[in-house]
Amino acid sequence: MADGELNVDSLISRLLEVRGCRPGKIVQMTEAEVRGLCIKSREIFLSQPILLELEAPLKICGDIHGQYTDLLRLFEYGGFPPEANYLFLGDYVDRGKQSLETICLLLAYKIKYPENFFLLRGNHECASINRIYGFYDECKRRFNIKLWKTFTDCFNCLPIAAIVDEKIFCCHGGLSPDLQSMEQIRRIMRPTDVPDTGLLCDLLWSDPDKDVQGWGENDRGVSFTFGADVVSKFLNRHDLDLICRAHQVVEDGYEFFAKRQLVTLFSAPNYCGEFDNAGGMMSVDETLMCSFQILKPSEKKAKYQYGGLNSGRPVTPPRTANPPKKR
């Protein structure tokens, strides 16, 4: 399908038609339409910086993980684009049942509102991860492997981080011991896969840990954990007020760390049907005041209770086959 043939409006209206239908209702899309979304959005990602500089007001959302019905609930709550500006922090695919609808609506909105709708890369927007955790299988079942590869080409061009009004630093995972200057992020060339170590890996994989000073080993077997001291030093050095990241299930949909200098957002309520967590969305107004909108979990009791940010971290098992042993 030639670029001009992609009818984004038609696709968006079809994707929104399932509002109010039974959760999980499949949206009919052609392979040509989905491929067109990937190609056009990839062009837009490459035309915009890898480190986005954004202005408030906007709403920031964490992991969605294919929970399409919950994504629609978020938009119902916060306003469907272009009613509000949005920044999503990655992890659109895998685990949930409707990764295709989820990523297609997000890419369609990116194409329709390129200056008001922004998507960062999460660790699941990476072929070696989404090959395993569900997206590949969903693409293969509903379309074909070639289309999954087209998504990979698109994901390899997503921006990595954003700064809101020079004060709020946003990324999917967290900080990196290699990050001294924002220029280092700007120098990352796209398209790129996510390496196993280094700056890009850390921005997508690292986690805060209240029991760590400085840098620690990460139970995921990838990247590091970092303490409150690292957060404070980073904010001071770059004259920032807040780090906003996702990547971990948190019970209330949002959770502060390091005396409110960092916030974790997670926007998939009842994650995987196994957690009793709420989903959170952060609204940043023109004065940079942050407030939180919460999607409550459904009433049914989850299989497991979840005790907070540092209890377990089930979000993604180790990336390597043999993670480094804890010393």
From Swiss-Prot:
Range of residues in the leader sequence = none
Q: Any one cellular component term from GO for this entry?
A: nucleus
Q: Where does Mn(2+) 1 bind?
A: 63, 65, 91
Catalyses: O-phospho-L-seryl-[protein] + H2O = L-seryl-[protein] + phosphate; O-phospho-L-threonyl-[protein] + H2O = L-threonyl-[protein] + phosphate
Q: How is the cofactor bound?
A: Binds 2 manganese ions per subunit.
Q: Which cofactor does it need?
A: Mn(2+)
Q: What does this protein do?
A: Protein phosphatase that associates with over 200 regulatory proteins to form highly specific holoenzymes which dephosphorylate hundreds of biological targets. Protein phosphatase (PP1) is essential for cell division, it participates in the regulation of glycogen metabolism, muscle contractility and protein synthesis. Involved in regulation of ionic conductances and long-term synaptic plasticity.
Q: What is this protein called?
A: Serine/threonine-protein phosphatase PP1-beta catalytic subunit
